[in-house]
Every structure is written in structure tokens, then in C-alpha cells.
UniProtKB/Swiss-Prot annotation:
Annotated organism of origin: Chromobacterium violaceum (strain ATCC 12472 / DSM 30191 / JCM 1249 / CCUG 213 / NBRC 12614 / NCIMB 9131 / NCTC 9757 / MK)
Molecular function terms from GO: rRNA binding; structural constituent of ribosome
Keywords: Ribonucleoprotein, Ribosomal protein, RNA-binding, rRNA-binding
Name of the featured protein: Large ribosomal subunit protein bL21
PROSITE patterns membership: RIBOSOMAL_L21
Listed NCBIfam families: L21
Annotated GO biological process: translation
Known partners and oligomeric status: Part of the 50S ribosomal subunit. Contacts protein L20.
Family: Belongs to the bacterial ribosomal protein bL21 family.
Function, as annotated: This protein binds to 23S rRNA in the presence of protein L20.
Length: 103
């Protein structure tokens, strides 16, 4: 059984017991969260696709940890103008574990 969920502006295919990194969610570590934006649920041959969401479907997950991703280096430059700009960015994320998928 798997589901397609939407969180943080992105879509993820998830199954029970899976761990994944999503955009930062304001929740404490080891707390339960309920993801209600379920786009699709598949259980064997039975597939339910929402338009756009599956009504009444939820995915329960546990927050495993919070962290920051790898640093991305940004370099801007204007030719012949002696302009250079260096920047860096590290995106915050939340690692979650999928506990249950309900229809």
C-alpha cells in the first residue's frame, strides 16, 4: 500500500515504514503529525485518485529529526563591471517516518 501526499509545495510517494526528508514542519521531535493532503492511494489493484484530494484520507507520520541540508553556493557576476557577489544557502528540513495510511 502506498500514497501520494503533498507537503511543502512538493509531492511524495510514501509507503508505511518509509523515512523521508520534507520541507520544515513546525512540530516537536517524536511527535505525531497528520498529513491530510492525500492526492492518491493505491492498495494492490485498487487505486483511488482524488480530484484534487482524496476525501477523508490521511497519512500519519512521526517526526524523527530536524536538520539543515547541504550548502548551495551562489555566485553572481556582471561582466566588465567588476561586480561579484557570493552567497550560500542551507535549506531546513524535517525527517519523518510514515506510520499509517488510512482511506
Amino acid at each position: 500500500m502506498y500514497a501520494v501526499i503533498k507537503t511543502g509545495g512538493k509531492q511524495y510517494k510514501v509507503a508505511i515504514g518509509e523515512k523521508l526528508k520534507v520541507e520544515q514542519i513546525p512540530a516537536d521531535v517524536d511527535s505525531q503529525i497528520v498529513l491530510e493532503e492525500v492526492l492518491m492511494i493505491a492498495d494492490g489493484e485498487q487505486v483511488v485518485v482524488g480530484a484534487p484530494l482524496v476525501s477523508g484520507a490521511t497519512v500519519k507520520a512521526t517526526v524523527v529529526s530536524h536538520g539543515r541540508g547541504e550548502k548551495i553556493r551562489i555566485f553572481k557576476m556582471r561582466r566588465r563591471k567588476h561586480y561579484q557577489k557570493h552567497q550560500g544557502h542551507r535549506q531546513n528540513y524535517t525527517e519523518i517516518r510514515i506510520d499509517a495510511i488510512s482511506k
